[in-house]
């Protein structure tokens, strides 16, 4: 039984590393883009799970009326997003949409796990805040080996071409998110102290 479990873990690890990456994103050329500054915070969206590796998850900032593309987060990838200190709202889109609220501080790095779950016709995704205590877990060490990706003209074109569908999902699913209990919303909120 242990041998079977070890083989399953190895196979899923290989799938995670070699999973389908979006051709609309490129590896980060300058890692200065992922470092917070005295007047900015960095929110890292990471998708370590191999589940649903063939499907892409697209993350936006939806703090204002505009859907600002964060990036296409593939299985086994990390996308860093620089933003201002304060409270922000993020959305992940696939078959449906899910939201996460984040309050971030300058000169800090925060992590959000893009988590796949089974949908009706395809994989759906949720945004889960990574709490400060999770940085001590072995799983976080594995994330350090995941590649950094950033947007290209192709990813921005995809966002533009799919803007109507994305907005429709935002409107439909934000109503559902707004109706969640205070406890459920708290679980989907990244706190200022949750930085690395």
State where each predicted segment sits:
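Short loop/turn and low-complexity linker motifs enriched in small/turn-promoting residues
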Residues: 20-196
């Amino acid at each position: 039984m242990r041998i079977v479990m070890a083989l399953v873990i190895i196979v899923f690890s290989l799938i995670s590393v070699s999973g389908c990456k979006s051709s609309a994103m490129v590896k980060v050329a300058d890692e200065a883009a992922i470092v917070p500054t005295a007047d900015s915070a960095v929110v890292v969206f990471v998708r370590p799970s191999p589940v649903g590796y063939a499907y892409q998850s697209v993350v936006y900032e939806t703090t204002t009326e505009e859907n600002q593309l964060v990036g296409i987060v593939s299985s086994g990838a990390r996308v860093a997003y620089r933003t201002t200190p304060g409270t922000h709202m993020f959305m992940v889109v696939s078959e449906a949409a899910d939201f996460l609220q984040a309050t971030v501080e300058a000169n800090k790095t925060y992590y959000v796990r893009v988590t796949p779950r089974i949908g009706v016709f395809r994989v759906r995704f949720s945004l889960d805040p990574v709490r400060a205590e999770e940085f001590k877990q072995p799983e976080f060490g594995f994330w350090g080996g995941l590649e950094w990706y950033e947007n290209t003209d192709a990813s921005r074109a995809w966002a533009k071409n799919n803007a109507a569908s994305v907005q429709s999902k935002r409107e439909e699913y934000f109503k559902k998110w707004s109706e969640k209990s205070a406890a459920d919303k708290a679980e989907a909120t990244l706190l200022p102290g949750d930085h690395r």
